[in-house]
């Protein structure tokens, strides 16, 4: 081993674990994400996805999620909103399709050709999480879903989104609803079985309340259901 390699190994052995996770992050993309997120959240998210793609943190997340979803290895989620819209309005697929169509959303908006199977499942999972966790696409709902997802994934993207919570608390009308939604979303995410391991493509026709029960979060919706 050369002196340079020895020095690198020595530095890594003494590196803070949190610093090690940040290795490989594209900080230019992070800066761009912060510059545009409030004006254009979708563009900000795309910047963060690019920022984390080659990071050790994201590799750790992907390996852990792939392990949780090992029974689905190699499977991607194919979504046909036209067909799903024909399902009853109380089903997972029916509610998801109506959510997407009403907001004019593209299920593949955050997926890229470079994604492997687990990355594709997580890329299309955001709005599925909205439906399962019961949150709309309002700012409060988005923060709550980010908290739910962070508890499941422990990823950079949702850390980034939640970093805007303190700024949002400056709006007095949001303070208590926002804090309550974020805490509830995080607790629900910790309680839920891994949603990434749930074969949504096999359960579109299932009533949403049964999906929630199978994931272990049905009790959060007793009054709603």
Residue ranges and their predicted role:
Residues 2-8, 12, 16-23, 29, ...:
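Long, solvent-exposed, polar/charged low-complexity segments
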Residues 1-82:
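The feature captures two recurrent sequence modes
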């Amino acid at each position: 081993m050369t002196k340079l390699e020895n020095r690198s190994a020595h530095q890594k052995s003494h590196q803070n674990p949190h610093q090690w996770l940040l290795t490989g992050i594209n900080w230019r993309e992070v800066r761009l994400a912060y510059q545009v997120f409030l004006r254009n959240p979708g563009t900000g998210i795309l910047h963060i996805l690019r920022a984390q793609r080659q990071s050790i943190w994201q590799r750790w997340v992907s390996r852990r999620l792939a392990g949780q979803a090992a029974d689905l290895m190699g499977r991607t989620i194919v979504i046909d909103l036209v067909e799903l819209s024909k399902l009853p309005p109380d089903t997972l697929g029916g509610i998801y399709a109506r959510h997407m169509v009403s907001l004019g959303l593209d299920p593949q908006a955050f997926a890229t050709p470079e994604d492997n199977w687990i990355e594709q499942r997580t890329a299309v999972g955001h709005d599925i999480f909205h439906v399962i966790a019961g949150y709309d696409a309002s700012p409060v709902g988005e923060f709550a879903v980010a908290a739910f997802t962070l508890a499941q994934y422990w990823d950079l993207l949702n850390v980034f989104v939640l970093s805007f919570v303190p700024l949002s608390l400056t709006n007095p009308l949001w303070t208590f609803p926002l804090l309550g939604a974020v805490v509830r979303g995080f607790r629900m995410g910790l309680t839920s079985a891994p949603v990434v391991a749930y074969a949504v493509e096999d359960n579109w026709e299932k009533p949403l309340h049964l999906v929630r029960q199978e994931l272990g979060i049905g009790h959060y919706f007793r009054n709603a259901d």
